[in-house]
Amino acid sequence: MKITVPATSANIGPGFDSVGVALSKYLSIEVLEEAASWHISHDLGDIPSDEHNLLLVTALKVAPDLRPHRLRMVSDIPLARGLGSSSSVIVAGIELANQLADLNLTDSEKLDIATEIEGHPDNVAPALFGNLVISSYINQKVNYVVADFPKSSFIAFIPNYELKTSDSRDVLPTDLTYKEAVAASSIANVAIAGLLTGDLKTAGEAIMNDRFHERFRQSLVREFAQIKEIGKRNGAYASYLSGAGPTVIVLTDQDKADQIKADIDALELSGSTHLLRIDAKGVRVEKN
């Protein structure tokens, strides 16, 4: 059995802790034979290979009596870069428990569990469902809407340094004035309306005018200003911090994507540039 989960990009400007899309980088978990104890084979560096791995912490929280297996983990989702690496593992762990214990969890049950573990649904929801997901988590209740993302390209610049979500949250204010909150909310409303109606020009303007988090975080990502300028020069819809950063994403028409990628590459920044597409499936399971 093989479980595959896409990367995700959350916030998309003003959709703070609420909006996310699934993108074409992937975590895969291959379930091998039963064993005396759990063991995860991987080449992902200094992460646990036993029950202390987040994958198994999650799976055993959902189904504590799972029989141990050998597993193989492969991922091209970089760690601590704002592309939902931990969310992909959480979703995979829930699906692992669901399959091995024959739990027959519904999509909503999976999302409830994932959100409880992660703390907010903006990454785990698109990892589960694919596409664009707008969600809220209030009083331990998740509400969500899944929608197709308008046809476009995502150019992701992934820096060669990590930025932990906790560090990125430390620069945020503890509160906003009522006037600021109303303005920030209205911008977010327009961004979502634009995305849902396919008006990427209007959505892009709203994304670039986020007031919830990017203005506070942009100093943590030194490449952000340069990449935004390239996007603007090439007529992209928007550039934004993916999740808490440091990955920067340029949202653009498909016919402009190659030029924007080439222009970012020409800066010779410390990192890598990737042309990504929407993943419309979310988590999937292939059985032998």
From Swiss-Prot:
Cited Gene3D superfamilies: 3.30.230.10, GHMP kinase, C-terminal domain (3.30.70.890)
Pathway(s) it belongs to: Amino-acid biosynthesis; L-threonine biosynthesis; L-threonine from L-aspartate: step 4/5
Key words, A-Z: Amino-acid biosynthesis, ATP-binding, Cytoplasm, Kinase, Nucleotide-binding, Threonine biosynthesis, Transferase
Compartment list: Cytoplasm
Catalytic activity: L-homoserine + ATP = O-phospho-L-homoserine + ADP + H(+)
CC per GO annotation: cytoplasm
UniProt GO BP: threonine biosynthetic process
Binding sites annotated in the UniProt record for ATP: P78, L79, A80, R81, G82, L83, G84, S85, S86, S87, S88
Disulfide bond entries: none
Pfam name, any one: GHMP_kinases_C
E.C. designation(s): 2.7.1.39
GO molecular function: ATP binding; homoserine kinase activity
Main location: cytoplasm
NCBIfam families: thrB
Role, per record: Catalyzes the ATP-dependent phosphorylation of L-homoserine to L-homoserine phosphate.
Family: Belongs to the GHMP kinase family. Homoserine kinase subfamily.
Name of the protein in question: Homoserine kinase
Organism from which the protein derives: Streptococcus mutans serotype c (strain ATCC 700610 / UA159)
Gene name as annotated: thrB
